[in-house]
C-alpha cells in the first residue's frame, strides 16, 4: 500500500461513511425496536441494512466502482468486515473496563472500538474487495 493523496482520500472517505452509517444503524436499531418490540430482531435488521448501505456507499464514493451491482462483491465486503467487527468489540470492551471515564460515557468506549476497527475494515476492503489488481 502506498500512502499517497489518493490513499488518504480513500481512508478519510471510508471513515466519514462509517460515521454516517453508524448514525443510520443506531437510528434503524431504535426504529425497529419500536416497530417489533424485539431488540435482537431489531439489531439483526439494523446491522444488515447498515452493512448493505456501507458497501454501496464505499463502492460508489470511496473506491469509485462503476458498473452494475455485484452481489458477490457485497458478500465479500460483508465477510471482509468481520475481523474489524471483532477488533471493534475487543477494543470497546477493553476501553469500557480499563478507562475509568468510559464506564459512565459508553460512547467513548464505542469510539475507541470504532477507531480500532476502522483500520482493519479499511485495510480488508482496500486489499481484498476493491483491489483492481487483485480482482483483475
Descriptions of predicted regions:
Residues 1-136:
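Alpha-helical membrane-protein topology signature
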